[in-house]
Structures are given as structure tokens and as C-alpha cells.
Amino acid sequence: FALGRDFLDAVAREAPDAVFLCNPNNPTGRLIDPGLLGEIADLCREKGIRLFLDECFLDLTEQGRSMKPRLADFPGLFLLKAFTKSYGMAGLRLGYCLTRDHALLRRMGAETQPWNVSVPAQAAGVAALGERAFLQRAKDVIESERPKLAAALRALGFRVVPSDANYLLFSGPTGLDMTLRRVGIAIRPCANYHGLTDGWYRVAVRLPEENEQLIAALREAAGR
């Protein structure tokens, strides 16, 4: 599931107008190799290809490094960020982008609806910026709990994809999501992702007691 050099070769060969990447990947949670990502950025800059990079989950990884320093030398780089992911504010829908392409920003501004960021979302965003210690605490929990959750899933016989993020991709019995829903637990079925089929799911890495509740429900659902 890791992005490889064949992708770099494909970009060089096909020369698309734009490249869209997600770092870390969703739904695998794997970070793109920094060297490879730098080469992709260099190639896109050389060929005049826009590079759109989703970094919405990057702040919740321990090893992830933003491409923000490359904005200075790559006008075609476009970074996507979100308070909703880093601070758990999904219902408020607050995100932003970073780019040197002012012409593109003006075009985007002309197409967006007026008042596209609500007052509650603005207030929550300002408050979140003051919570500098929160992200580190969140990362500490994720780094501690992710290997435990992955090991528990493997112990149930599920295939688990290595992850650097706050979620795990695993394969198990089909219909597992519906079984868990009946006991009040939601996991993300991933059959609609390219290359995945029924039986692939994504789960969040949460607090210890919540992860234990998930594993207990999975154990019962799988008859283990």
C-alpha cells in the first residue's frame, strides 16, 4: 500500500495537469517517504504540474513533516489543512489551504459561497490555536495506543496495515461494520476506496478504554 517510485515514473511519463496526494495516506495511515515526496515536488515544479497535498492528518503523526518550507520555491504547491481533524471538530467543518498561487486563490474565492465559514467555526478555530499542548498530548496517546490496537486486531486474525496516523486499516469478515453498528460502534467500511473490497475497514485509535471496548465487540462479532 506504500507509494513507490513507479508513481514518480508515471507522473514523468503522463505529465498530468495536477497531482493529488494525501500525507499520511487515507485510509492506510502511512506517511509518504520524505525523499520520494521531495522528488515528486521537484518533478512537478520542473514540468509545471500543480501538486495538491492533503496534510489534514499530518499534525497527528509523530514523524510527519509538512511541505510548508517548499512553498517558497514551488508556486504550484497547494497544501490542505484542517482544524476538524487535528482538534476533533468535524461538525464545524473548518479548514484552510496554503499556496503562493495568488491567482488560483482569487479564482477559488470567486467560486466559493459567501459566509462559507460559520461564526462558531471561527470561534472554535481561534480557541484551538491557543491549545498548543493538546496536539502533543493527542500524539502521545496515539503513539502509545496504536501498536496495542494493531496487535489486538492481529490477535483476532485480522490483517492490519502498518500506520503512522491516528487510524488503522484492516481486513476482516464482510458485514462487520453492520454487526458493530447494532451495538453502537461505527467503523468505516472501505470498499469504496480504489483497490479495496468488501471486508476492509478503518478504525480510529482512541483512548485505552474505548479501544478495549472496540476489541471486545470485534471479538464477539468474529466469534473469537
Q: Which residues does each PLM region occupy?
A:
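Active-site pre-lysine segment of PLP-dependent enzymes
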Residues: 4-15, 27-86
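Short beta-strand-to-loop capping motifs
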Residues: 99, 170-172, 205-207
